[in-house]
């Protein structure tokens, strides 16, 4: 089936079922909580640390988001920033980066250190952002290394991938067909996501506010919707009412309490 026909059929499907779905937005969806960069806004924790993953697990987060970079010597390092304390993730050696401390006194962890901690837990999922590289030719190796390590530690079935770059997303979908991949950049419609093989969208709060209809459209296509980064009660209420599947937040306990309150528990 060529792309034009496939797109036409998807749009026909949406036009048929969207009116009914629009009437039930937010109903029946059990929104799940994802701790942004782990649960770090709590005593003794830090962003993208082993502790933040374990603390996310300790409060029952559905998922703990983590950022990973590929270093100059081809080691995967957990950190958000492209440059951290003067060290550029892509051009420095892993030994230099791993010797740098986080705000809670821990050293910057390798990806394997996070996976080792994850293996000791049984519930919380890893929401893994593979970071864009300046050298896109490294994407096949970077994704392949991620896939091998997830299998090595036995946590592939508890991991979901999130990416910004289109080339990186395509490589993840190609190399990890059994793993759900979500798009972060906000520039693809639900129909385009479906066509490219994504499991759903993981879009910034402002993008989803400007395109509320995408939530129902995504659900109609069997896709899921995650939104980031939602930290106030008012905005949490907004996206719960919209019926998103996941909310990524720096305030996971606040969101958990709100969900319990709304369910009457």
Report residues per predicted region.
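Bacterial Sec-dependent N-terminal signal peptides
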Residues: 1-28
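Phosphate-group recognition and catalysis centered on beta-loop-alpha active-site segments
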Residues: 21-265
């Amino acid at each position: 089936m060529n792309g034009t026909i496939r797109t036409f059929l998807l749009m026909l499907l949406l036009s048929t079922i969207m009116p009914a779905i629009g009437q039930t937005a937010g109903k029946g969806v059990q929104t799940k909580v994802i701790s942004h960069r782990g649960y770090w806004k709590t005593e003794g924790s830090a962003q993208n640390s082993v502790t933040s993953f374990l603390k996310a697990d300790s409060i029952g987060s559905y998922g703990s988001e983590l950022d990973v970079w590929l270093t100059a010597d081809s080691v995967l390092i957990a950190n958000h920033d492209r440059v951290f304390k003067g060290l550029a993730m892509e051009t420095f050696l892993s030994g230099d980066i791993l010797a740098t401390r986080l705000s809670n006194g821990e050293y910057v962890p390798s990806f394997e250190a996070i996976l080792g901690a994850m293996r000791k837990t049984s519930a919380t999922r890893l929401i893994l952002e593979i970071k864009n590289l300046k050298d896109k030719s490294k994407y096949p190796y970077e994704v392949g290394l991620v896939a091998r390590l997830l299998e090595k530690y036995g946590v592939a079935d508890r991991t979901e991938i999130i990416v910004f770059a289109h080339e990186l997303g395509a490589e993840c979908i190609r190399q990890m067909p059994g793993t759900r991949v979500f798009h972060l950049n906000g520039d693809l419609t639900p129909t385009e996501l479906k066509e490219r093989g994504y499991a759903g969208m993981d879009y910034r709060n402002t993008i989803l506010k400007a395109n509320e209809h995408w939530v129902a459209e995504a659900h109609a296509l069997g896709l899921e919707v995650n939104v980031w980064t939602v930290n106030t009660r008012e905005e949490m209420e907004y996206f719960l009412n919209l019926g998103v599947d996941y909310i990524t937040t720096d305030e996971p306990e606040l969101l958990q309490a709100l969900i319990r309150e709304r369910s009457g528990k």
